Regions:
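Acidic, surface-exposed loops and disordered segments
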Residues: 1-196
Length: 196
């Protein structure tokens, strides 16, 4: 039995992939292969999107020079643990339709689907992913060459092989466990959202 299985219990018969995947901070510094990185983005490529606009953009760092630049975008507690990740990814959502210039209302939703596809594929490869809101969003545009007029900075992602909890700063040891989820009954309602 894995730690995930000991802590998490599905309420329905879902694929174990959904329950076993969790967002580790402890990541091994071992580099990922070009083939592994390609597979992650191939999974993201096949995510569904409204009108097939595929509004996501991923800028990643896996080489020493680009990793050094990417680490400067981390902030807060993320600096302490994510700096050792062998792959850092920054995710953006396109703001406007490429043909009409109209706002893409579903861009963030669709970009989230692409990130989820990447995360599940990473788990299938024996890798761990952790999304980070704690990045210098305002600096991502210039440092990564992404036009702010066209894209919105969403998240950073640290990716790597699972590492040892003891590699983390002591204050993060207790938090390095899979967490639980709300019951489906708390967020899925047939017909109408009930009055509270």
């Amino acid at each position: 039995m894995t730690i995930s299985q000991a802590i998490r219990r599905a309420e329905a018969d879902v694929d174990p992939l959904f329950v076993e995947r969790w967002s580790r901070r402890a990541l091994d510094e071992r580099p990922l292969s070009r083939a592994q990185i390609d597979v992650l983005f191939e999974a993201a490529r096949w995510a569904p999107s409204a009108n097939n606009l595929q509004p996501w953009l991923f800028v990643y760092a896996s080489e020493p020079a680009s990793l050094e630049r990417a680490r400067s975008l981390l902030k807060g507690n993320n600096i302490a643990w994510a700096s050792t990740a062998p792959l850092l990814v920054f995710v953006f959502a396109r703001k406007k339709h490429p043909d009409t210039g109209a706002p893409i209302r579903t861009a963030q939703f669709d970009t989230g689907a692409a990130w989820q596809s990447l995360a599940l594929q990473a788990h299938k490869l024996g890798l761990s992913t952790r999304a980070m809101g704690g990045i210098h969003h305002d600096k991502t545009y210039e440092l990564l060459g992404v036009p702010e007029a066209d894209y919105e900075s969403m998240i950073g992602i640290a990716i790597g092989y699972p590492g040892e909890r003891e590699s983390l700063p002591p204050e993060l040891h207790e938090r390095e466990l899979p967490n639980q989820r709300r019951s489906v009954r708390e967020f899925a309602f047939e017909g109408r959202f009930p009055a509270r």
